[in-house]
Amino acid sequence: MSTQRRMVFNDNYWGPPRERLPELRLRASTQTKVSPLTYSHTVGRGEQTGQGFRYPVALAVNPRTGLMYVANRSYEYRIELKRLTICTVDEHFVGQFSTGGFDDGQIFWPRGLAIDQEDKVYLSDEWLNRISIWSGDGEYLGKWGTAGSGAGELNRPAGIAFDSQDNLLVVDGSNHRIQKFTKEGKFLAQWGSFGNGDGQFNFPWGIEIDSHDHVYVADWRNDRIQKFSPEGDFVMKFGSSGSGDGQFNRPSDVAVDKDGDIYVTDWSNDRLQMFDSGGNHLYTFLGEGTLSQWGNSKLDANNYMWNERQGAWGLEREKYFEHPIAVDVDPEGRILVLEPYRTRIQVYTKNK
């Protein structure tokens, strides 16, 4: 066997070259505060099908069933690997559904996931400019949406989220606005336009709706988070461009827990940031990921892969976040951080 040392960057990733190779660097936290979160475990491994992920980009947890849905974008030259995975935060693999393509029930560039009060799964597809719908066990139910810039039309839809009335809010990314629909696809309202003023957007991405129906939007290219009333009136904003605490370099998603604390995946800064309800910075997390049960089980069954890991260098990097793309809070209050390039979800619990 060759003694050449190889660099390994993620949990069991053996796939094709990544779409983007970020700057590699060792990081050390200089924070003196006690962390408000404790790392729990990791879910996921790189896998072409079945128990694992392939370039996962979105997740959603059903608060009634506990099932977690993960959208796998894969790569354009392996569209058969595009799929939705069903599992749990406790690493129980349930199944998968859909595949890559342009037909009804297929996906191409999945971007956002949300679950309605009837346990149906909704997915935004930024290539197909539509919302697709499945039952909780993966039966295709229908779709809606057309491409364009008029009211109710979509241009690269991104994050999606349901409010308390079961209306679906859609981040209409390339139209730089938020649109509200009934879950059947009837247009209700919209707000936003291109720009950097209050209530304007520059390629917005992720969205969150809190228990009071306030709307939070990750304003991606403006490097900030904006908060709106349920009617779409501007409430506040926080963040600026940079790499310091409270600054962002392309924030991709936002989540709010039951205490009102806010979590932001700071995509190009390779980190998760936590804020209080007023947008004041509380803590910056760099990642503490370990091998998942899925990853360990695969390595246990393959001595060659174990030996390759033992001979690899750069393993100290794999615990850190690499371009975290989505964040969610599950029914138990656990913080879930999704990483496409490391094909995993890091799970954290909030300290009392």
Residue ranges and their predicted role:
Residues 2-352:
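Eukaryotic scaffold repeat domains enriched in small/polar residues
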